[in-house]
Each structure stands twice: as C-alpha cells, then as structure tokens.
Amino acid sequence: IQDRLRTTSFNDTVQMHREQLRSLRRIEFEFAVPEDALPLRRPVARFPYVPDNPEKRDEHCREAYQIQVQGLMKRLTFTKTERVVIGVSGGLDSAHALIAATHAMDRLNLPRANILAYTLPGFATSDTTKNNAHRLMAALGVTSQEIDIRPSCLQMLKDIEHPFTGGKPQYDIAFENVQAGERTSHLFRLANLHHALVLGTGDLSELALGWCTYGVGDHMS
C-alpha cells in the first residue's frame, strides 16, 4: 500500500489503457441467448495453480522452490554475506526454509556449516518437536545449537508483571508474543555477532491467515 501511495505512475498507465480502449474497432451484432444450459467446452480447475496432474504439480512445486533458492542466492551474493541464521522449530515452515538454504549454499559452493541453525524451545515446546529439529539439522549437516529462551522470557514476563509469573495459568497473546519476540531477538543478535543474515521462515499461508504480528516472529520473518 505504501508503495502504491508513493508511486504515481499508475495513473499514467490507466490513462494509456483508456486511450487504447478508445482506439479499438467495435463490431455490433445480434445474438440470441439459448434457453438450454450451455456445457463448458473445457473443465475449469478448482485450484488452477495446483494442477491435478501429479507430474505437472511436481513441476510447479519445483519451480516455486527454485525461485526461493535463487532469491536467497541473489541476496547473499548482493550483500556479500556467506552465513545465514535460521530458527528451526521442528515444524514444516522452518524445515522447508532450512532445506532451501542448504541448496542455496551448495549452489554457491559454500559449506553448509555456514548455516547457523538454532532451535529455541519455549514453555510449550514438546520433546517430539525439539527432537525433530535436532534430527533435521544433523541430517542436513548444518551448524546447530539449542538455546533455551525460557529464562529470558520469564524475566520479561516479570518485568511487565504478567500474571503467569505469579502462578496464574494465563496463556494470552502477551504470553505468546513474549516468546515469539525473544526468538526473533535472539536470531537477530546472533546474526549481528556472526555477520550473517537472518533467514525468515514465514510463508504466504501465514500471511493469508493473518499471522503477521508486528515486531515479532511472524512480521519479521
């Protein structure tokens, strides 16, 4: 929206399009509307960007994946950066981002050890999720480390006098965003320390669902 407000060339395009429409030749004719139902000449796919044909669907997925890899390669090359920092939760989004990062490093002839992957367990992190994160990082051969964010989260919750610190089981949005914010803060400070870029793990599905909390994990990634 801000880009549209700053850029004023869109009005020029509208005017040009209007003039082009005026120059089109118009041919009038009469057409009798049939009373019977008209069958469609071709089936219209319910999900046009996700083909029913498995081979075509795989082709589309590979293309989208290569766009991600190429975009990361371009950013690393442009900024002359050889390391990335990424938070790995054990879920699907961060797993996909981590795999894309490994392929970008391979194509740039950089060691996968330059991917600094961190799992940052919080109050609700399960052993299964944490183990999945460790197994994935080990399988991909990246530099991995675990940082428990609970102490720093607890300090912030105490600072803001959140009822959780008094023993009340209040798991509200403040409780959740303290953890998201701590994770993001850790990752950016680690990137500063190691002269790296933070690789976001958010995706368009999160954006479509409204998961873009300002200032913390979703918005920053």
Describe every region a protein language model picked out.
Residues 1-87, 102-113:
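RNA-binding accessory domains that recognize and position tRNA/RNA substrates
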Residues 21, 28-45, 110, 114-174, ...:
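A conserved beta-strand->alpha-helix junction
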Residues 105, 140, 163-221:
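Active-site adenylate/phosphate-handling loop in enzymes that bind or generate adenylated species
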Residues 1-6, 138-143, 218-221:
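C-terminal, active-site-flanking charged/polar segments
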Residues 89-101, 128-131, 160-162, 213-216:
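Short glycine/threonine-rich loop-to-helix capping motif typified by GTGT followed
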Residues 100-108, 136, 219:
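A glycine- and small-aliphatic-rich helix-loop capping segment at beta-alpha/alpha-beta transitions
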Residues 79, 86-89, 95, 118-121, ...:
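Generic beta-strand/beta-sheet core signal
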